[in-house]
């Protein structure tokens, strides 16, 4: 890939709590990103990845469609401050390894914080922003981006923890356009080699949830 996008909330969760594998983060990444699959250190650290190693033609591409609505009613949640919340030490270590590995294979690492009143704070934003600036990595915090047009009365399925299908479509459209413009990524929707993506998209959009 030309660009590898990492959602940032995982940086504040303990790596060791997930199966107690020191290579958990990179193991999981290798299940999804081809260039990471042959790194010798990651081969036998993670025992079971059944939930992630399904067939490549899986329609949802990792996202479970949910159109249910449970509004978030807590009001503004991104209050500017100088506070910092420390990243998990192991997660931060592997974040740097991912950056270096991406660069060594001609890919750029991009950090993105998804909209989530229940999970995200300005303290987390500050810590990720500090790391991104120190390591020359692009960072986009969607919690501070009004252009998304997220409506917390209708775009969340569980009171501001996760976006529902409508909210996810807004984020996908914005991030797709942003990455295309910022990195010159080509639109492959009319490329016959990627026809199955459009077919899967139609089937996925019409599926019940």
Residue ranges and their predicted role:
Residues 126-203, 208:
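C-terminal regions of proteins
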Residues 5-10, 14-106, 190-209:
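Secreted/periplasmic serine-hydrolase-like ester/acetyl group-modifying domain
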Residues 70-150:
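Flexible, glycine-rich surface segments
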């Amino acid at each position: 890939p030309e660009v590898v996008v990492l959602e940032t909330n995982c940086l504040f969760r303990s790596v060791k709590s997930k199966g107690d594998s020191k290579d958990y983060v990179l193991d999981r990444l290798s299940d999804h990103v081809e260039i990471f699959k042959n790194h010798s250190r990651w081969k036998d650290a993670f025992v079971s990845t059944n939930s992630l190693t399904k067939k490549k033609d899986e329609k949802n591409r990792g996202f479970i469609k949910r159109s249910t609505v449970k509004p978030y009613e807590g009001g503004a949640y991104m209050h500017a401050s100088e506070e910092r919340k420390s990243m998990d030490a192991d997660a931060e270590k592997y974040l740097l390894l991912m950056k270096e590995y991406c660069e060594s294979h001609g890919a750029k690492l991009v950090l993105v914080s998804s909209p989530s009143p229940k999970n995200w704070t300005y303290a987390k934003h500050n810590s990720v922003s500090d790391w991104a600036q120190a390591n020359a990595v692009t960072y986009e915090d969607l919690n501070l981006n009004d252009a998304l047009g997220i409506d917390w009365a209708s775009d969340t399925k569980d009171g501001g923890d996760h976006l529902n299908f409508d909210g996810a479509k807004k984020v996908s459209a914005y991030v797709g356009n942003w990455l295309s413009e910022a990195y010159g990524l080509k639109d492959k929707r009319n490329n016959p080699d990627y026809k199955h993506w459009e077919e899967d998209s139609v089937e996925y959009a019409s599926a019940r949830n």
